[in-house]
Regions:
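N-terminal helicase ATP-binding lobe
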Residues: 1-723
Length: 723
């Protein structure tokens, strides 16, 4: 089954969206929501002396705090300090992590690049005497821009103070929220790199519009639904619909419903009244029903169609979604539309609409993601054939987002001490890489030939279940291939689990599987037995029929009979025993290992999947496949979301919108991808904090597809379907 198949929500999916997002993510979502009203808003969590002491500034305190908690020479106070203020801060200490003390420490160490960077932060209530003193220190220092450029990896990529950075909207979000407030009908072409909050942007837009969020891949929609519910945004679902009657309201959006007389909760919802719905989650098939439904409660001018990844299924000439997409576009009457993607095709959109067209495209990224070829060499644009370099330059100038796949350290080496920068604020990762592209345009053949002899080789990464496992560092990895079963078999083979141990594991798994099948039948029998009875009343009174009681007792007996199965740590990648086995204990600090809890392993072991997948799960390896049972998929997704899995093996179905954080990606040699789909694939990596990310190509051809202009099947097919 293709994941773009339009289906209703399963019980597991309903349950999964009810789980709240982590606290840090919730804070980001709240900021985006508030940011719609003030796109320029910034905030910084770093404490100043005032915010740490929880007191309000005044001139006397400015002087007193600077004199008391810093070593800055101060003149005698001329403004008397109020007795109440003196008592409030008496005997209190200020830690070295407050803003002013960090600034002074950096000045003392001569780290003036970081001083300049930190002076630009939006820290609340900084001490003016400290700021003035620091600026005086800076004025006496002449920046060495050549050296700072050479040190860019340490200063920018490995900036130890990056955790202090301001929280603000991405540039593309600021522009989107500004354009969305413009009067009149509009088509917004919203293009931004993956992992920069595009799927979160509808949350901000919901402050002005009632949103119909459409995506062909259900797991993308589920991610947004979960975020909305965590913010108490009222949602409804139009998934797998054959009519408006199939639309379902979340309880929070229900107006008319029948209460459970015993519990006081909602027993039955009238799904026809959606007047409270703020965000409608829809698939492509159900959109027109969702549109008509929403228009019964809101004028169409107050509704916005947010179509995420509209080019899904447009990389092939024929697809079951094509006629549905064509009908959607022709019959849509919602005047405000956002087409959101990392890779909207370059084409003339004026032929598709009479609305005002706005194009939002921001490709800047502070991330660096290394590309590695099958020979374990780093890939840079100048490693492509010399004849291709002019095309490469033009392509990179038009698609700045691709520069995040250009290794910063390699670029700095390429510059050989050259720098166009004159002040610290100009020295950024995007600016350095753009300068690299400028130099690339003037590269001679002799220079190109010299660079080919300087290829940087990195450690082998392919045997990631054995001696190379430590290279899967800093977070979970994902391996994308069409034939995931082949990769799964490779994992088991290279893990070198002894045949005797595998035989015993298979025996135990087979035993548990037989119990699982029996329990599955009993659960079905239990459900059937309850169908014709007044279950609600009987369960409340703790009274069940003898037949039901017998089934329940048998279920309990089988559940306790399930064997606990564990794989020795020596075969679980990057555990202490595994690293010791391969003699790489010195890599323990960077190596990432799984941390799947015992209850999840137990649940997976009783799931109806291939025994090899169960062994892989014990190794910390999950499989994303449309063929996998929903229960298994939800269990694995939950562990991936929590950063508990070591590696995920995934088919191309999961290229779009897998909004989990991966540090490394393997791209299988059996993948055949258009440029747009390749960029979507690479976007699975680099969504988290600033750590060393990597993408390991198993075919050299991917670099050419990425860095040179390519014919776009998506553009041709979109033009056909939207006309």
């Amino acid at each position: 089954m293709d994941v773009t198949t339009q289906t209703k929500l399963t019980r597991e999916e309903w349950n999964s969206i009810e789980l709240p997002v982590p606290t840090e993510e919730l804070s980001i979502l709240q900021f985006i929501r508030q940011g719609f009203h003030d796109p320029t808003r910034k905030e910084n969590a770093m404490k100043s002396m005032y915010t740490y002491l929880k007191i309000d500034p005044n001139p006397a305190l400015d002087h007193y705090l600077c004199q008391t908690f810093t070593s800055i020479p101060m003149k005698k106070m001329t403004i008397p300090l109020k007795k109440a203020d003196q008592i409030r801060i008496q005997s209190k200490q200020v830690p070295d992590t407050v803003y002013e003390k960090v600034l002074l420490s950096l000045c003392a160490k001569g780290e003036f690049f970081h001083v300049e960077w930190m002076l630009r932060l939006a820290v609340s209530k900084p001490n003016p005497f400290v700021i003035a003193y620091v600026r005086e220190c800076l004025a006496k220092h002449t920046p060495d821009m050549v050296q700072w450029t050479k040190d860019a990896v340490q200063l920018l990529e490995r900036n130890p103070y990056v955790s202090y950075k301001d929280r603000e909207l991405y540039a593309h979000q600021k522009e989107l929220f500004t354009v969305a407030k413009e009067a009149g009908s509009k088509l917004i072409l919203y293009v931004a790199p993956t992992g920069t909050g595009k799927t979160m942007s509808p949350i901000g837009l919901s402050e002005k519009y009632h949103i119909i969020f459409v995506c062909a891949a259900k797991h993308v929609s589920m991610a947004l639904a979960k975020m909305c519910l965590s913010l108490q945004i009222k949602v409804a679902f139009a998934l797998g619909c054959k009519g408006e009657e199939d639309i379902k309201l979340h309880y929070s959006a229900a107006i008319d419903y029948v209460k459970n007389k015993k519990t006081g909760g909602i027993a039955k919802v009238d799904n026809t009244n959606g007047a409270k719905v703020e965000v409608m989650i829809s698939d492509v098939q159900s959109y027109l029903y969702a549109m008509q439904y929403m228009m019964r409660f809101q004028p169409k001018e107050k509704i916005l169609l947010y179509w995420d990844e509209p080019t899904i299924a447009m990389d092939v000439e024929e697809h079951p979604l094509h006629p549905i997409i064509n009908k959607l576009w022709k019959e849509n009457v919602i005047p405000n539309v956002v087409l959101s993607s990392a890779t909207l095709p370059a084409m003339d959109y004026s032929a598709l609409t009479t609305c005002t067209i706005y194009k939002i495209q921001n490709g800047e990224s502070n991330k660096t993601i290394q590309l590695v070829n099958p020979n374990h060499q780093l890939i840079l644009p100048h490693h492509l054939p010399y004849e291709e370099i002019p095309k490469v330059v033009a392509h990179l100038e038009a698609h700045g987002d691709l520069l995040k796949y250009v290794d910063l350290g390699s670029v700095v080496a390429f510059l050989k001490g050259r720098t166009p920068f004159t002040k610290a604020s100009e020295l950024t990762i995007p600016a350095i890489k753009q300068y690299y592209v400028t130099l690339l345009a003037t590269m001679t053949r002799e220079e190109w030939e010299a660079e080919q002899k300087k290829r940087i080789v990195v450690p082998s990464t392919i045997r990631f279940c054995s001696e190379d496992a430590w290279t899967c560092s800093h977070g979970p990895s994902i391996y994308i291939a069409e034939d995931v079963q082949k990769i799964a078999s490779y994992c088991l083979k290279t893990a070198a689990i002894p045949a005797s141990l595998l035989q015993e594991l298979t025996k135990q798994l087979s035993y548990n599987q037989s119990l699982s099948e029996k329990m599955g039948q009993l659960e079905k029998d239990l459900e059937d037995s309850n169908k014709d009875s007044d279950k609600e009343k009987k369960m409340t009174d703790n009274r069940v029929s003898p037949e039901v009681k017998k089934i329940q007792e048998e279920l309990k007996r089988l559940q306790v009979s399930v064997h606990t199965i564990a794989l020795p740590n020596g075969y679980v990648p990057n555990t202490y025993d595994h690293l010791l086995r391969y003699g790489v204990l010195d890599k323990q600090a960077m190596a990432f290992t799984s941390d799947v809890d015992a209850s999840t392993i137990e649940k997976v072991l009783t799931t109806d999947i291939d025994a090899s997948w169960k062994v892989l799960l014990m190794m910390g390896i999950g499989v994303f496949s449309a063929e996998a049972p929903p229960r298994y998929m939800e269990l694995v997704k939950e562990q991936v979301m929590k950063q508990k899995m070591y590696v995920v093996l995934a088919t191309s179905d999961y290229i779009y919108g897998t909004n989990y954080q991966f540090a490394n990606l393997y791209l299988g040699k059996d993948m055949r991808l258009s440029q747009e789909k390749l960029i979507q694939t690479l976007g699975r990596v680099g969504r988290g904090k600033q750590v060393p990310y990597s993408i390991r190509f198993r075919d050299d051809a991917f670099a050419t597809v990425l860095f040179t202009p390519q014919e776009s099947p998506e553009a041709r097919i979109m033009l056909r379907l939207f006309s």
